[in-house]
């Protein structure tokens, strides 16, 4: 059974829209954990558009489950991670003009830099995950740079309509098996919703799903704890063929 990492970036988005002090993503963590979150995910972007450095420091002290820090593979972010010591770091691609992360890391192109960063973080007992597209060549290189985890990008699956979704699901299943054969542990995320999560949750070998936007959206209607509970129930007892789009 996959666990659930709740991404709270969108809570910070609301706060930063007015550059004020509320809503406070740090305070919302307790509600997410009460609802059953197995971990908390935040992305500290280079432009600080939502999560701020102060949030990170407070989250390190208040998260009772585990803290997953998403970040770009830069010297600044590596230094922050080494000082913070989150439970895991997920390296993601980042473009200032994008609304959200648009694709996976190109591990092949950035192999030397990624290997160096992974060595530095791993040397301080911080495991590293690489957010990648479900492509065999990328997975092979994830293993070669000594990543402990990969997070498979589910974005293409998430936007696919009925006729093509089985193919995307098959690719994710095959990629999970391939990653594990390379000794990698596997997470997945991006674009997952209450309507499309169950087939992904049913894939054998995926250990955690990182989900944010749909949970925060649902929380506006039912509250954060209930929104997390509803998502957790779908992940615990997934129906392999349930895709409601």
Swiss-Prot record:
Q: Which of this chain's residues are annotated to bind 1-deoxy-D-xylulose 5-phosphate?
A: 9-10, 45, 50, 100
Q: Where does 3-amino-2-oxopropyl phosphate bind?
A: 7, 18, 191, 212-213
Pathway(s) where this gene product acts: Cofactor biosynthesis; pyridoxine 5'-phosphate biosynthesis; pyridoxine 5'-phosphate from D-erythrose 4-phosphate: step 5/5
**Which Gene3D superfamilies does the entry link to?**
Aldolase class I (3.20.20.70)
One term of GO molecular function: pyridoxine 5'-phosphate synthase activity
Q: Look at the named UniProt entry and state the broad enzyme category this protein falls under.
A: transferase
The EC number(s) given in the record are 2.6.99.2
**Annotated site residue numbers, Transition state stabilizer:** 151
For this entry, list what GO says about its biological process: pyridoxine biosynthetic process
Which is a Gene Ontology cellular component entry for this protein? cytosol
Q: Localized where? A: Cytoplasm
Protein function: Catalyzes the complicated ring closure reaction between the two acyclic compounds 1-deoxy-D-xylulose-5-phosphate (DXP) and 3-amino-2-oxopropyl phosphate (1-amino-acetone-3-phosphate or AAP) to form pyridoxine 5'-phosphate (PNP) and inorganic phosphate.
The entry describes its oligomerization and partners as: Homooctamer; tetramer of dimers.
Query: What is the name listed in the Swiss-Prot or TrEMBL entry for this protein?
Result: Pyridoxine 5'-phosphate synthase
Name the source organism.
Prochlorococcus marinus (strain NATL2A)
Q: What is the lineage of its organism?
A: Bacteria, Bacillati, Cyanobacteriota, Cyanophyceae, Synechococcales
């Amino acid at each position: 059974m996959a666990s659930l990492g709740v991404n709270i970036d969108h809570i910070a988005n609301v706060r930063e829209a007015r550059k004020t002090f509320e809503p406070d993503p740090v305070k919302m963590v307790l509600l997410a954990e009460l609802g059953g979150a197995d971990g908390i995910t935040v992305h500290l972007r280079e432009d600080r558009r939502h999560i701020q450095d102060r949030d990170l420091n407070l989250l390190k002290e208040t998260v009772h489950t585990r803290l997953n820090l998403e970040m770009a593979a830069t010297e600044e972010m590596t230094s922050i991670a080494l000082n913070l010591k989150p439970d895991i770091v997920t390296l993601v691609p980042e473009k200032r003009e994008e609304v959200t992360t648009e694709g996976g890391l190109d591990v092949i192109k950035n192999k030397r830099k990624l290997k160096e960063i992974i060595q530095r973080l791993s040397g301080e007992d911080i495991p590293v995950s690489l957010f990648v597209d479900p492509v065999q060549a990328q997975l092979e290189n994830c293993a070669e740079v000594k990543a402990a985890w990969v997070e498979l990008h589910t974005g293409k699956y998430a936007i696919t309509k009925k006729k093509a979704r089985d193919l995307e699901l098959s690719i994710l299943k095959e990629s999970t098996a391939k990653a594990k054969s390379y000794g990698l542990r596997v997470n997945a995320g991006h674009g997952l919703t209450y309507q499309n999560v169950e087939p992904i949750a049913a894939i054998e070998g995926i250990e955690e799903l990182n989900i944010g936007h749909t949970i925060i959206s649902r929380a506006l209607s039912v509250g954060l704890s209930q929104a997390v509970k509803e998502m957790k129930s779908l992940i615990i007892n997934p129906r392999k063929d349930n895709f409601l789009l």
